[in-house]
């Protein structure tokens, strides 16, 4: 693998913020394709310079990363991405901006073609701890929670309505069965009442006959006792005593 091949797989990234690290650049450019390494050069005092070199595993990732990420903002600074000096992509028409052979940040012109990040279609990039990843906003999470709560309430209401409907159907079915059973049980009630009334009437007539005979017998005994007593207590005329005796003999 020669130097030219490595240059074809490398991008120059300028106008970096001093807070940007090699790890941040690595994770940022990883979305364009697999990487081999990221290098931020240092000056004689050991301070990081404001540009970096990104080395991709595949050459096809280089122009794709340039079109995808050139002009985005990182820590408030707009990145200036170019092909590295010596890259064959520079000589290809429409692949490299003017004066791209000089990688020095001091001579770096604006981003390619003067296109803004909005024209490139790439969002701004600000990482948490140096990198930011996509996440759901609080409003989105709140709406999702409200939708979930509404769905749960609707399901509970449907379950309650279903249980009430089933209970009502069971009660209606039980009332219908009970009414039919009671109707069947009362079908012979008029005849039974007539039978009871007939029996009560017969018993009542027998009791009346018995009571009448008993009173007649007591009345005859009374007259008989009065006649034997000699009439000391009461004086009855002879005709009445005779009638009493005749009634007594007739009774017996």
Swiss-Prot record:
PANTHER family in UniProt = RNA BINDING MOTIF RBM PROTEIN -RELATED (PTHR13798), RNA-BINDING PROTEIN 7-RELATED (PTHR13798:SF11)
What domain of life does the native source organism fall in? Eukaryota
Q: MF terms per GO, please? A: RNA binding; single-stranded RNA binding
Cross-referenced InterPro entries: NEXT_complex_subunit, Nucleotide-bd_a/b_plait_sf, RBD_domain_sf, RBM7_RRM, RRM_dom
What Gene3D superfamilies does UniProt report for this protein, alphabetically?
Answer: 3.30.70.330
- Know anything about its domains from the record? The RRM domain mediates RNA binding; the RNA must have four nucleotides for efficient binding. Mediates the interaction of NEXT complex with promoter upstream transcripts (PROMPTs) and potentially aberrant forms of other non coding RNAs, such as snRNAs. The RRM domain exhibits specificity for polyuridine sequences.
- A Gene Ontology cellular-component term: nucleus
**Annotated knockout phenotype:** Morpholino knockdown of rbm7 causes several degrees of the severity in the phenotype. Mildly affected fish are unable to swim away normally upon touch stimulation. The body shape is slightly shorter and sporadically brain edema could be observed. The moderately affected fish have a curved body shape, smaller head and eyes. Heart and brain edema are frequently observed. In fish with severe phenotype the body shape is completely altered, the tail is absent, and the head and eyes are smaller.
Composition bias (Polar residues) maps to 88-107, 119-137
Task: Cite the record's note on assembly.
Answer: Component of the nuclear exosome targeting (NEXT) complex composed of MTREX, ZCCHC8, and RBM7 that directs a subset of non-coding short-lived RNAs for exosomal degradation.
Source species, please? Danio rerio (Zebrafish)
For region Disordered, the annotated ranges are 88-137, 171-252
The protein's name is RNA-binding protein 7
Q: Where in the cell is it found?
A: Nucleus, Nucleoplasm; Nucleus
Q: Where in the sequence does UniProt note compositional bias of the Basic and acidic residues kind? A: 211-230, 237-252
Alphabetically, which GO biological process terms does the record hold? axonogenesis; cerebellar Purkinje cell layer structural organization; regulation of alternative mRNA splicing, via spliceosome
Q: Note whether Transit peptide occurs among the keywords.
A: no
**Domain RRM, first and last residues per copy:** 9-86
One Pfam family from the record: RRM_1
Q: What does this protein do?
A: RNA-binding subunit of the trimeric nuclear exosome targeting (NEXT) complex, a complex that functions as an RNA exosome cofactor that directs a subset of non-coding short-lived RNAs for exosomal degradation. NEXT is involved in surveillance and turnover of aberrant transcripts and non-coding RNAs. Binds preferentially polyuridine sequences and associates with newly synthesized RNAs, including pre-mRNAs and short-lived exosome substrates such as promoter upstream transcripts (PROMPTs), enhancer RNAs (eRNAs), and 3'-extended products from small nuclear RNAs (snRNAs).
